[in-house]
Amino acid sequence: MKRNISKVAVLGSGIMGSGIACHFANIGVEVLLLDICPSELNESEKQKNLSLDSKAVKNRIVNEMFNKCIKSKPSPIYSKNFIKRIKLGNFDDDISKIKSADWIIEVVVEKLEIKQKVFDLIEKHRTPGTIVTSNTSGIPIKLMSKGRSDDFNKNFAITHFFNPPRYLNLFEVIPSPNCDKHLLSFLLKYGEKYLGKTSILAKDTPAFIGNRIGTFGIQSLFHQVKNGDYTIEEIDKLTGSIIGRPKSATFRTADVVGLDTLISVSKGIYDSCKNDESIEIFKEPDFLKKMVKNNALGSKTGKGFYKKIKDNLSLIHI
């Protein structure tokens, strides 16, 4: 089956969803970016006498998330002119529009039950044969594919982008148990030729390849701080550009990834790999759990290990 990708639907407009939408727009693809509708009005909407049925309210989440992404640095998009390639909408009003998409990418929160609800919507509205992929950073595809139709699973895989999607080179592809071999080949080649990535075929193992290694490295250093061996400043000075790695080093990288995402991936590994010789490394330290509880999730909430004040980053002492 010859495939041509002229329109992509991205379901979920968070930091990854909006970033992926921008990167497809960068290469000339039309994008439909959707997210959920709010469950209640904010103060501004109340003052304007809007209702939950108002279009502005229904699109509030996707608008806010996308605008935040566009303003982020480094820019997720090559040119502001490319923004017009991205259409915004919500699941209630616009989900039927995925029928015309050549590729549907799920990028919602890392909870299996929520992803399954999104897959139900996709099954209802997609055109048979359409590619469906998940950007999960660690949920096994064998679990996500349960209960899905034969056509869905034949065209289903994980395509794991790394944050930020425009800049990070790795692109992991994990096929569903019944994935069509031609689709798998297509995704790997598309990642290389059009998305500008290094495509890697990974097995359906906990956290795949990149996050299994990366999470181990980050968590190892978290425990160094917990044990009082090093400070955050010392670790970031020693694990950044001085050794040829990005200047975000360890703790700033964790902020970019999202501390809640980091905990989710770590927990998935901890629960699934009991025989791993270093399993205790994946058990998050108490200070990390406390930060997430206080909504200090990193870049997505404006504070994590670092807090942005105007154009400068200041370290928050934990």
Regions found by a protein language model. Give the residues of each.
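N-terminal glycine-rich phosphate-binding loop for ADP-containing cofactors
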Residues: 1-316
